[in-house]
From Swiss-Prot, chain A:
Quaternary state and interactors: F-type ATPases have 2 components, F(1) - the catalytic core - and F(0) - the membrane proton channel. F(1) has five subunits: alpha(3), beta(3), gamma(1), delta(1), epsilon(1). F(0) has four main subunits: a(1), b(1), b'(1) and c(10-14). The alpha and beta chains form an alternating ring which encloses part of the gamma chain. F(1) is attached to F(0) by a central stalk formed by the gamma and epsilon chains, while a peripheral stalk is formed by the delta, b and b' chains.
Function: F(1)F(0) ATP synthase produces ATP from ADP in the presence of a proton or sodium gradient. F-type ATPases consist of two structural domains, F(1) containing the extramembraneous catalytic core and F(0) containing the membrane proton channel, linked together by a central stalk and a peripheral stalk. During catalysis, ATP synthesis in the catalytic domain of F(1) is coupled via a rotary mechanism of the central stalk subunits to proton translocation.
Site (Reversibly protonated during proton transport) location in chain: 61
Top-level taxon of origin: Bacteria
Official protein name in the record: ATP synthase subunit c
Keywords per UniProt: ATP synthesis, CF(0), Hydrogen ion transport, Ion transport, Lipid-binding, Membrane, Thylakoid, Transmembrane, Transmembrane helix, Transport
Transmembrane segments: 7-27, 57-77
Subcellular compartments: Cellular thylakoid membrane
């Protein structure tokens, strides 16, 4: 792998993780805030709120995982490496 | 096999509370009894309330196992054995990831004020292992890892029926 490909892969890996984590991070923060407020306001619905939070977190965090996987593939299994 | 338990385990103490021993012959029946009590009464403690969450995780775990078995059989029949092994490895990672996520969400608001990121180690370790072992393939392992998403969707679709059965 030549030096330009290596440098571009490292930069792209950093961007994939960094940019890919911004949106889910904001979304998870607001979802957790809403869930904790909901549990505090309505403790009898705690199980249902936590279940819904688990579903939404699993789907939101998969966006971060996509970026993470792209970054790891670029770093450890780069298809552009000669 | 250990289910996806987050914080508190479901104990079958409904028998001792109610005194109707014939209804609580199996563990699942006692879990259902306890959950229907939880749904009916609103003034219980947090341990009783989290039983619904534990049962939800158990349902997701069972559906995940069924989806994983189906995907493994399909990949053995139509692709090859290495792809099926990679898919199974990814599916195991997905189950561990979901368990860690559920554990973090279970402790949200009790012992921690934010959801931890420990579960993200699992896909990192999966990709690293698949990249190092030459017999494993990356794409089937990622597909196997993401099998928890159809399980969650199926669980979401089946939830009204499960809730109806619990109330009845």
């Amino acid at each position: 792998m030549d030096s330009i490909t290596t440098a571009a892969s490292v930069v792209a890996a950093g961007l994939a993780v960094g940019l890919g984590a911004i949106g889910p991070g904001i979304g998870q923060g607001s979802a957790a805030q809403g869930a904790v407020e909901g549990i505090a306001r309505q403790p009898e619905a705690e199980g249902k709120i936590r279940g819904t939070l688990l579903l939404s977190f699993a789907f939101m965090e998969s966006l971060t995982i996509y970026g993470l996987v792209v970054a790891l593939v670029l770093l450890f299994a780069n298809p552009f490496a000669g | 096999m250990e289910p996806l338990l987050a914080s508190t385990s479901v104990t079958s103490d409904a028998n001792s509370r109610n005194g109707d021993g014939d209804l609580c012959s199996s563990r699942e029946t006692s879990e259902r009894l306890k959950l229907s009590e939880d749904l009916e009464s609103s003034g219980n403690n947090s341990g009783d309330l989290s039983a619904e969450y534990v049962l939800l995780q158990l349902r997701i775990f069972r559906i995940n196992l069924v989806v994983t078995a189906f995907a493994a059989v399909v990949s053995i029949l139509f692709v090859d054995l290495n792809a099926a092994i990679s898919l199974l490895l990814g599916a195991c990672s997905g189950i561990i990831y979901l368990r860690l996520l559920a554990k973090n969400i279970g402790s949200l608001g009790k012992s921690s004020s934010s959801v931890g990121k420990v579960q993200l180690i699992v896909p990192v370790a999966l990709v690293l292992v698949v990249a190092k072992v030459p017999d494993l393939h990356l794409l089937p392992s990622l597909v196997g890892f993401l099998l928890y998403k159809p399980s969650l969707i199926i669980q979401f679709l089946l939830e009204p029926y499960a809730r109806k059965n619990l109330v009845n």
